[in-house]
Amino acid sequence: MRAPTRVYLRGVGRRYLSEWPFNEAHEKILREYRPARHYRLGLFIPCAYGKPYSQSYIHYLFRRTLAPYIREGLVHEIILTNAGVVPRELDEYWPYTAYDWNPHMETEEIRACYRRVLKKRITDYLTAFSGYYDEFAAYMRHDSDSWAALREAARELGLEIINLAPPSVDPRELEEAGLGLPEYMQDPDLLLVTKTALERLDEGLRRLLG
């Protein structure tokens, strides 16, 4: 049988959550992927509009705080997205570079489906690979569906996963982080690159890894 064409997926809904190619990509990770080493910390982080995620504005800024810990092999980034649970070293590969999920188009039904599908995938990942990590933490908005899915998966597995991001910051910090650009100001994850959030991230990493 001829292999399916590598398409670009743009939209929201079940088609962009649990069907081809994301379902197959998830199964392939469970079947063939292995973390490169044993890590002190597995850090769950959000996806980004820019692809690959590592070159997006949000990831570029908070990775500057993570950089020393990544270089020392202490922290492994694990990205949570409608496309699945994506280890950082796979974020430059299809299909994770070829989709656009617009959160402004989500309905409550779609959000519930997102949480349900992502929770299952997180549970799969933690069950398969938790032996590669001493512990886990998150750095994502407290009001995000990804954090809700992660908390539920952790609860069912009996794991404690703390969120190193602050619940909120001064709105003036958001304006500063957004550089006055509308495309940045519209991103709710802008909170993660504010001064307060980045300081909180660094303090949390020092506490966990010091």
Predicted regions and their residues:
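Conserved beta-strand scaffold positions in the cores of enzyme catalytic domains, especially
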Residues: 43, 77-80, 161-163
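Active-site and ligand/interface coordination hotspots across diverse enzymes
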Residues: 1-70
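Short connector loops at secondary-structure junctions
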Residues: 73-99
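Glycine/proline-rich loop-helix segments at beta-alpha junctions forming the active-site rim
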Residues: 112-210
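Short acidic, S/G/P-rich loop/turn micro-motifs used as interaction or catalytic elements
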Residues: 49-54, 84-88, 105-113, 143-147
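Short His-Asn-centered micro-motif
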Residues: 45-47, 56-57, 80-83, 138-142
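Flexible, charged surface loops at secondary-structure boundaries
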Residues: 34-39, 70-72, 125-134
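Anaerobic metallocofactor- and corrinoid-dependent redox/one-carbon enzyme cores
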Residues: 93-94, 102-108, 138
